[in-house]
Regions:
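Terminal-appendage/accessory-domain detector
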Residues: 1-103, 199-213, 219-455
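Hydrophobic alpha-helical hairpins/lids featuring a short glycine-rich hinge
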Residues: 86-143
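Short amphipathic alpha-helical face segments that pack within enzyme cores
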Residues: 108-116, 160, 164-168, 213, ...
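Glycine-rich, mobile lid/loop segments that gate access to catalytic sites or pores
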Residues: 118-217, 228-235
Length: 455
């Protein structure tokens, strides 16, 4: 029998031997923007009911006040702070996403894990940047050479995020290759999440678990806790379990690691709209029609949006009664684009969803399950028929915020300001922006954390 490709060992050695100087300027710049964007999303997350429940839970189970829960004066142990911060980062689904390899929403978990642990260890900004880049690199290497785990009912965000969080924390703790392998083995057994949970509080709970899982795995491994040393590639291991036996390309997983880093190319996407990424093309097409033709909703007879079968199954909701459900319902997103001409945080509140005008608008949207569009939906046709018989249509192909149609650095910073102002003062906001933009020069990441504590 052929000897298995040593994926776990190779990746662990790469992480242990990685040098900050080998990470390109573009990768580092992108890393900073994704970290900043995630912190902004997390600060908005503080205002949600999901967060309120999580904060109370942390008070009940967390008795070691060593790490800060962002946007609050509350502290917890590093694993529990990572849990809370991971949840905050994904609470409103306004954090980054992967547009190419079904890697979910990586940054919320990796940043929550590494910044929560980094606060305890007194890590530098350079150490945090390196650890973050490595966490993203390894989880995307796995995802790029495996099938879509969501086709098997798992949620890719926590499955892969657990790996990324553990790698980032292992880097921060400067673990040896053997201990990194142990951390991977530990985190693999804590990974998981069911895709059906989108549109519920459990979706950000998945990110919370992955961040906590990564911190715990690295801390246990640091102290000598052992695990299977070939967990990624071994029979009945991580890849077999989540992706299916024989479905992963292990040779490709260990080819050209960091050449370039995924953060440089192809890169992660940043969210222009505060809803789930699969709705972005429909949103962009609808907003184009609204603005280009100055559509008055009173003149609209019906709206049609075509999506492929799997997207129809996952992102059409016959009934939308909560803002959270609306984030994942393509018919709601399209209705709001044509009705209001914009998507804002307030678009996805229970109060907004249940307005009579909004519910009436929903009835005008017909979502068509179109088998001629390939999965997962690389383009999205939207048509608006007016009461006078005029038919207007537009097809969006690359969403705003996709790495191929990126947000500018100024747009990312303005998005952060808009989010952060809900929780912290302007002076703190600007201090945090400056710290992240020059993260290599930050001597202790406590500086970043302190800027997120409300005055």
């Amino acid at each position: 029998m052929a000897k298995p490709t040593p994926v776990t060992d190779t990746l662990a050695r790469f992480v242990a031997e990685a040098d900050f100087s080998t990470i390109s300027e573009k990768a580092l710049t992108n890393a900073k923007m994704h970290i900043l964007d995630t912190l902004g999303a997390a600060l908005v997350g503080v205002t949600t009911d999901t967060a309120t429940i999580a904060f109370d839970y942390c008070k009940r189970v967390g008795h070691n006040d060593e790490a800060t829960i962002w946007g609050t004066r509350q502290k917890a142990s590093a694993p529990m702070a990572a849990f809370a911060n991971g949840l905050l980062g994904h609470a409103i689904d306004f954090d980054d996403w992967d547009a190419f390899i079904h890697a979910g929403h990586p940054t919320c978990m990796v940043t929550a894990a590494v910044l929560s642990l980094g606060e305890v260890t007194g890590s530098s900004g350079e150490d945090l940047l390196k650890a973050y880049a490595l966490g993203i690199e390894i989880l995307t290497k796995i995802a790029a050479n495996a099938p879509n785990v969501q086709d098997r009912g798992f949620h890719s965000t926590p499955v892969l995020g657990s790996i990324g969080a553990a790698i980032a924390c292992a880097s921060l703790l400067r673990l040896t290759p053997d201990k990194i392998k142990a951390a991977l083995g530990i985190t693999a057994s804590g990974a998981g999440g069911i895709h059906r949970q989108q549109g519920s509080m459990v979706k950000p709970f998945h990110a919370a678990n992955a961040a906590r899982n990564g911190v715990e795995a690295a801390l246990l491994a640091e102290k000598g806790f052992t695990a299977d040393a070939a967990i990624l590639e071994a029979p009945r291991g991580f890849c077999d379990t989540f992706f299916g036996p024989g479905t992963c390309n292990y040779e490709k997983m260990i080819e050209n690691i960091g050449k370039p880093y995924f953060l440089e190319s192809p890169g992660l996407g940043l969210k222009w709209h505060p809803c789930s990424a699969p709705q972005f093309l429909a949103a962009d097409a609808s907003l184009y029609l609204k603005r280009a033709h100055k559509i008055d909703f009173a003149s609209v007879a019906k709206i049609e949006v075509n999506i492929p079968p799997l997207r129809y199954q996952r992102h059409y909701a016959a009934e939308v009664k909560t803002g959270l459900r609306g984030k994942f319902a393509i018919n709601y997103v399209v209705a709001m684009c044509i009705l209001d001409g914009k998507l804002e945080l307030t678009t996805f509140t229970d109060e907004k969803v249940n307005q009579s005008q909004v519910q009436e608008a929903l009835q005008k949207v017909k979502v068509i399950c179109d088998e001629t569009i390939p999965e997962p939906g690389p383009y999205c046709p939207v048509a608006v028929e007016l009461k006078d018989g005029t038919r207007l249509s537009h097809t969006a192909k690359i969403a705003k915020g996709d790495p191929r149609n990126p947000m500018t650095e100024d747009e990312v910073v303005e998005k952060f300001r808009s989010n952060a102002k809900l929780v912290i003062a302007d002076k703190q906001t600007e201090k945090l922006i400056a710290a992240v933009r020059d993260l290599e020069a930050v001597g202790n990441v406590q500086e970043m954390v302190d800027a997120m504590i409300p005055n």
